[in-house]
């Protein structure tokens, strides 16, 4: 009995808009995309959305470092992110930004509803404050010495060396990571969401059975330790949305970030006539809402987010699907080893469908970390996709196109074998539905083994050489093509590009329902290579490219930090005051006001300018090494200061009878001293 199509809204966690997409991000987006494509293949209506998380202190500060506005930076990052996701065939219906009018309106509406319903309170708190930048400092923007193990240069919330967690006020010798200044404590009024009021609802939601066991168990730990009020405000300066009715107070990024799911969908609804925002988000909605996220943000999605929605009168998610981290070759991704691989770097070297297949072959419904072993990656894709599945088509297609004008046999020779393949649809479909992708892939490759075993036993290449075996040859090859068709229908959510090429080859769209009946008396097209095996040299080239990218980033960061440090230095830091001298030593130096009569370049001298100076009744010739700072014509007629009693010095280009005084580090950064109006040539400088 046919059932009505399900209506689903599916989201991926919003990538932060201050960096590139890497293969860790891609695990989640590939996992979600496979699930979404399966749902669409089964006739369900899916709206698949995402957005950039575009607010917060890190974005504000990075834009400042780049010398551009936050808006300019997040626009460029959004373009890069969307290009990367498109490169991996992530089939979003809409990709938006949390820095949007839709998000401003929805975040403000939710806040005001929570406030009206008694879930918002305020109180004064003390925080570390950067006196130079005049800004409150998030924990990660304070650095100092760990209070436990005494390791230096540790963040304000935890120690990378010993793992200790602490508050930034416990750091020894804390410094602002923004300016290097010593922070001070300062009071500020902050606004809080009263999460403990939702404990009963959250416990009931946890016990509903829809959450993963690991997530439900973790939530139980949080309940046992006690829920706390959540600080939802930040002080100016801050890149984000101002809190309605408050001056210089902004929503903390984690308040408006999940609202970005709603905003992206609202943006999609405004583009289409067939979607209704309230139908998907009203409290009694019959549509389904699913979030795919990483295990590092479970706290926000399983506690704060459903509580915010409940408190503001919206529906809650049906489920939050959580995945683990990506490791490479058994270890944390490393920039120095070249295993911190950006999505764009991967796309420059390898087929995205290879990674889609490999991730699918290792993904399950649990919160397990996934290891991208690059040697296994190469071997598995080549063995499974090329040798088992695509090879099934290539070893049979030639006989059909060359001997039978591309026509499959009129009768299907192996109905029992075919029915066995079709019967697997229910099992494989259920595995896709429950996100047990690795088990689905094992089912598919086991069928591929069986199909190849059949072809090996029937040996069409032998039949092709025997007279009178034409009918059997056509039937055997047609069975091989049809079994390949079933396998590719099952693989379509994982490898959409390979599926599209297969559809062109078969002259037929791959659908879940159509495979119930084999293709007979059907014309296929001439076989072309459908998929290329992975060349290990390309994997090595990708690793080397990642190392080069990391080295370039490190060099740029080092340069920026050096420039930042130099900019924070005073002139006295750069060149400390010299040792004290007696007054008599100073008074021995005779400095006079001089008017520059003429100034000209010295032929064959890289640094020198030649001056004629009027010092009040006497003209002096002086050579000065300020050529890189001034053009001669800029100086003529100006008053300056010279040392008049310096012993004349014979130079290659003539006699220098004194010294012009200038300030600055050198090169083009030099400035001659100029007295105020009223000073006259010859006057002594005291």
From Swiss-Prot:
Predominant cellular place of this UniProt entry's protein: cytoplasm
Gene3D superfamilies xref list: HUPs, Isoleucyl-tRNA Synthetase, Domain 1, Methionyl-tRNA synthetase, Zn-domain, Nucleic acid-binding proteins
GO molecular function: ATP binding; metal ion binding; methionine-tRNA ligase activity; tRNA binding
Residues binding Zn(2+), per UniProt: 146, 149, 159, 162
Protein name: Methionine--tRNA ligase
Motif, 'KMSKS' region: chain positions: 332-336
Protein's job: Is required not only for elongation of protein synthesis but also for the initiation of all mRNA translation through initiator tRNA(fMet) aminoacylation.
UniProt keyword Cytoplasm, yes or no: yes
CDD domains in the cross-refs: Anticodon_Ia_Met, MetRS_core, tRNA_bind_EcMetRS_like
Domain tRNA-binding: 585-686
Stretches the record annotates as Disordered: 550-571
EC number(s) on file: 6.1.1.10
Textual note on the cofactor: Binds 1 zinc ion per subunit.
Keyword Zinc attached: yes
